[in-house]
Curated annotation (Swiss-Prot):
This is Probable pectinesterase A. Keywords: Aspartyl esterase, Cell wall biogenesis/degradation, Glycoprotein, Hydrolase, Secreted, Signal. It catalyses: [(1->4)-alpha-D-galacturonosyl methyl ester](n) + n H2O = [(1->4)-alpha-D-galacturonosyl](n) + n methanol + n H(+). It is found in: Secreted. The gene is pmeA. Pfam families: Pectinesterase (PF01095). Its main location: secreted. It comes from Neosartorya fischeri (strain ATCC 1020 / DSM 3700 / CBS 544.65 / FGSC A1164 / JCM 1740 / NRRL 181 / WB 181).
Length: 324
């Protein structure tokens, strides 16, 4: 999503780094001022080592990761606001990202969904730019690429790849812009208030895109999928084999709006999971072969698109990078 420019400050590691603005550039081949560096020419050889170096500081900080594949499983629990940048030749999209973080383990093997995650975010105010995150386990079990379990999170030009339970938008307010999300079964799930703007969402097998877990009526959580492209893996016939979602918990709330829905979407649109569920499922102003709502089930009517204020609350432009 491209919004009017708003200058946001980003401090470096603290004692020696000066404040510098988030930069909108056609490429990012070197570290922004003040960032710790990871990679063959960086100070640290692993992302985990750079995270450890941040210690207990509460200052704003940033990490720049040079091109490469990093076989790591990382938890981000820094006490300050942290921004993580990946090297790329096109900052505006995930398509030319040169940094991949990958790990392979299923949830049963790890013990919990969170423990299976390649990247587990627990730090409020965290931002990630142009990084690919993969759980390589594949078909057969839940295996999470990203757990996003904090408030005011932003992911820009990132890629998240898995099969079942790829992206666990677990809790807090979250914003995904120009990202790629891949999976087959419940691959965007949880109970965050999450806005997905101008993302490519690709199913690689029959299944369900969302599995939202809103439980009680007083919870303000939503999944809003806005101006996104929903499609299937090239060469795989998924015609009418994918549902927009099913309710992991009884009051799931999801809207697809202003998006392109391909023929992979089943005419029924939505299906069931949680016993006794009365989900709030909406569609508004979508286009494409999968956008016909005449045979939809479990769907409620809505008179217009929902706003970012509705999903993320007032003041969202104080923590989202609106220059992106």
């Amino acid at each position: 999503m491209h919004l009017p420019s708003l200058v946001l400050g980003l401090l470096g590691l603290g004692l020696t780094a000066s404040a510098s603005p988030i930069e909108e550039r056609s490429n990012r081949s070197k570290a922004p001022d003040g960032c710790l560096t990871v990679g063959s020419s960086g100070k640290y050889s692993t992302i985990g080592a750079a995270l450890d170096a941040l210690g207990d500081s509460k200052s704003d900080a940033c990490i720049f990761i040079g091109a490469g594949t990093y076989k790591e499983q990382i938890t981000i629990d820094y006490k300050g606001k942290l921004t993580m940048y990946g090297e790329t030749t096109d900052t505006s999209s995930y398509k030319k990202n040169q940094v991949t973080i990958t790990h392979t383990i299923s949830s049963p093997q790890a013990g919990t969904l969170d423990k299976s995650a390649t990247v587990n975010v627990r730090s409020d105010g965290f931002k990630m730019y142009n990084i690919n995150v993969i759980n390589g386990y594949g078909k057969g079990s839940q295996a999470v690429a990203l757990v996003a379990n904090a408030d005011k999170l932003g992911f820009y030009g990132c890629s998240f790849v898995g099969y079942q339970d790829t992206l666990y938008a677990k809790a807090g307010r979250q914003y995904y812009s120009n990202c790629y999300i891949e999976g087959a079964t419940d691959y965007i799930f949880g109970n965050a208030s999450a806005w997905f703007g101008e993302c490519d969402i690709m199913s690689v097998g029959p299944g369900y895109i969302t599995a939202m877990s809103r439980t009680t009526a007083d919870q303000t959580t939503w999944y809003a999928i806005d101006n996104c492209n929903i499609y299937g893996k090239p060469g795989v016939d998924l015609t009418a084999k994918v549902y927009l979602g099913r309710p992991w918990r009884v009051l799931a709330r999801v809207i697809y709006q202003n998006s392109q829905l391909s023929n992979i979407i089943n005419p029924k649109g939505w299906t069931t999971m949680a016993e006794g569920a009365t989900p709030l499922y909406y569609e508004y102003n979508n286009k494409g072969a999968g956008a016909d709502t005449s045979k939809r089930e479990y769907e409620s009517s809505i008179s217009g698109a929902v706003s970012m204020n509705t999903v993320l609350g007032s003041g969202w432009n104080s923590w989202i990078d609106t220059t992106y």
